[in-house]
Amino acid sequence: MKKRILVTGGTGYIGSHTVVELQQSGYDVVIVDNLSNSNADVVDNIEKVTGIRPAFEKLDCLDYEGMDKLFTKYAGIEGIIHFAASKAVGESCQKPLLYYRNNLVSLINLLELMPKHNVKGIIFSSSCTVYGQPDTLPVTEAAPIKKAESPYGNTKQINEEIIRDTVASGSPVHAIMLRYFNPIGAHPSALIGELPNGVPQNLLPYVTQTAMGIREQLSVFGDDYDTP
């Protein structure tokens, strides 16, 4: 019997690529996404790439009762990969409370529901922003955690502490935290990639959307940094 994995934010950029890799590695995947920054068509494209249609539920991880019912519906989930989060640094400075609610409560709900439904493991999508302004480059896991420079970065720092405290309390939950830098690119099939809803909050979607003709031009601000 295939092992079942829940991927939150599974129609997003990193999430969709992870779902493809999981399915191609023989896992049974359940996707949860509220589609706030992605499109349900991604599920169709995942099926085109892998030949397997993952289970998909349009659901917000903030909805505790909804998530509780999901774990019951898809009994036997063995692990969670938690990507679902608000992720734009600039926007987090404008809407800090939105980021604290979305990014903290969603994780807390999962950590509370995991023991109830006998889910043992979680991989948490953290961020390189937890390092603040590092003393040296390149940054390694041994680098000290510095003061976060945005509410987004602070939510990732706090979430890591929540996970550490939960595990240290004797909870049966096992956790891994992955601190990503800036992923770019798309699947070789070009069926999945980074195509956020609305105005992109980071550079690469602007570049690709301009190349595709979705946007008329790409603005470059400043003239004091030589481009190699």
Predicted regions located by residue number:
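Catalytic helix-loop patch of NAD(P)-dependent Rossmann-fold dehydrogenases
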Residues: 94-97, 101, 105-112, 116, ...
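Conserved NAD(P)H cofactor-binding loop of Rossmann-fold oxidoreductase domains
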Residues: 84-87, 126-127
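Active-site beta-alpha loop architecture of Rossmann-like, nucleotide-cofactor-dependent enzymes
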Residues: 38, 86-90
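A conserved pocket-lining segment of Rossmann-fold NAD(P)-dependent short-chain dehydrogenase/reductase
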Residues: 92, 144-145, 181-228
